[in-house]
Amino acid sequence: MAHYFVGDVQGCFAELKRLLAEVDFNPSRDELWAVGDLVARGPDSLATLRYFQSLGDAGKTVLGNHDLHLLALHGKLKRDKPSDNLAPLLNAPDIASLIDWLRLQPLMRELPEHKVIMTHAGVPPQWSLDVLRQESQLVSQALKQSDYLEALISQMYSDTAERWDPSAIGLNRLRFCINALTRMRYLYVDGHLDFDCKQPPEDCNNPQLRPWFEFTSALRQSHTLVFGHWAALMGKVNDPKLKALDTGCCWGEYLTLWHLEKDQKITQKKLKKG
């Protein structure tokens, strides 16, 4: 059995299939773990979502910011942008089934026997594993409710929930978890989230900002953290316990697959149209 972790697919289904064929992925024996953002911008979000749904227990994904945005679009809470390439998905006959499957996906997954944790954007350095489990579970519980659109999705967009407050309750607590696990790149030196800078560290000109993974974290010392979201990193982080897998396939770069047991990365260049 092999565990394969894939970066932000974002509708780049042809590239995903190429990678899986190259490693002879077999869902009857192997598992495919995705760091989230299965949809948006790429040419075939519909096929991507259908494929992961079809994998059953052999497919494991977490929610990314684009996945959450899809929930908002389907709920008519946001307007679809042509650049997101989501019209075929939103108009698909099985969209309700796909949405119901997607909203049941968590914000974090772990592989305890390998001490691997996967989230979309990273893990706040202030959090222990117990806190990570607890906070992500609170969001999952909210997404499972029949009123999830009104109670959570319609109100999740907020740049004000940028500081971790263990005494926070209700929506503000959920907002911080969503912001941290699906949007985080940089933190200010005092530990609160920045939502603006997307450049790689060498190009960030704000001395008050540091990548989230440069802060001291007990969890990062004990576990391997697998994440995506930050395409500008192009997978380059100077720490063997960090696996940055977003390498910008939907922007014309690469889709990256990491084979856990071999600690090996395999890449597929964005395919040309036609």
State what each model feature region is:
Residues 1-55:
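N-terminal active-site segment of His-dependent metallophosphoesterases
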Residues 2-5, 18-21, 42, 55, ...:
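Hydrophobic N-terminal alpha-helices or hydrophobic patches in metabolic proteins across all domains
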Residues 6-7, 33-36, 61-64, 119, ...:
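Active-site neighborhood of phospho(di)ester-bond hydrolases with catalytic His/Asp-centered motifs
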Residues 12-14, 40-42, 66-73, 126, ...:
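Active-site environment of divalent metal-dependent phosphoester hydrolases
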Residues 27-30, 56-58, 118, 222:
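A general structural motif
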Residues 31-36, 81-90, 193-201:
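Short, basic, glycine/proline-bearing loop/turn elements
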Residues 46-49, 54-170:
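Active-site neighborhood of divalent metal-dependent phosphoester bond hydrolases
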Residues 133-274:
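Acidic, His/Gly-rich catalytic cores of divalent-metal-dependent hydrolytic chemistry
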